[in-house]
Amino acid sequence: DQPGLGKTLQAIGTVTIAKAYPCLVICPAALKINWQREFKKFAGKNAMILDDRNKASWHRFFETKCCNIFITNYESLKKFFVLKVKEDARFTMKSIEFDPRISLFKSVVIDESHKCKSTKTQQSKFVEGICKGKEYILELTGTPVVNNNTDLIQQLKIMGRLEDFGGYKYFVERFCDGPKQSSNVKELNWRLSSTCFFRREKAKVLTQLPDKSRQYIEVDISNRKEYDKAEADLIQYLRTYKNADDEKVAKALRGEVMVKMGILKAISARGKIKVFSEFIHDVIDGGEKLIVFAYLKEVVQELKKIFPEAVTVTGEDNATQKQTAVDRFQNDPSCKLIILNYKSGGTGLTLTASSRVAFIEFPWTFSDCEQ
């Protein structure tokens, strides 16, 4: 589903109706407390967040019928469910020795499953191994395809559905051809919908809501000279690759070019802070709440200095701090502003207290912004 249409509630309902316990929920760290609350709210179930205190004993809570829902984040999968990772030249599923206790789970819910889109990372392989043989596997995401159709391969494999699409080789040849690695899209969409994919769109579901309106505000950045100098430096650097072959250009894009573009992006963001702050003042002085997204940590910090009463959600906050910030923004009438960065605050948080969101800068990937 698109963001905001209740994927969490649907997953809880599915697990509850199917009596698919014990259930493991894998989600971003910032969302663990929210999942725990939602299970209590909608299913009346007490869910346990896995941590160092229950690392060795969590299964006892199920065996004694005290708890049958367990929640962990992607980064902790190795700690709780992997005994050993062999240092093989080629990392495969055979390189991983899993804790036998993973066989206890009847269902696995994978929130923000696009985080498992890579076929090569340990994180994706851990999720795949944990899900193997499970009766129910639910993948939740608003953006199943972040870059191109290859993003679907590992997600389908985790669900045990890749063979329904002809296997890895056929999928790549049929649906990942061409310069954009996307082909036969209509056929792929039909086959997904016919097998394992359920998607709702806001335009079709939330028909009684007013249309979303977008406003673009053009500003003169306060550090124009610094920006022009950095831009000229980038242009001069790119000219050296005017006649370069594709391999050389690709290598450059992975290195110094991206660094220089990042510098340009940072200068631009800093230069917008003064005017952007005036916009924020206009909104909150008018009695409205506002959600602000930024990409760079230093931009969040500068805005926090200007608006010390604001709450923030960043990578430096732990799960409890993030949830506390969200709760205050949602429930405290005097808290008018929340500032988030895309990675930590862009997924899974409930921020319905405001109908206005502003972006001082965009992330590298548009889907992060849309999410």
Kindly give the residue locations of the regions a language model identified:
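Conserved P-loop NTPase motor "coupling/switch" region that bridges the ATPase
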Residues: 21-23, 41, 65, 107, ...
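SF2 helicase/translocase ATPase core recognition
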Residues: 112, 134-166, 171, 205-234, ...
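SF2 helicase catalytic motif II
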Residues: 90-139
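Walker A/P-loop
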Residues: 1-14
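Conserved Walker A/P-loop ATP-binding site and its immediately adjacent core
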Residues: 20-43, 146-151, 295-297
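Interdomain linker/hinge connecting the two RecA-like lobes of the SF2 helicase core
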Residues: 2-3, 113, 119-120, 149-156, ...
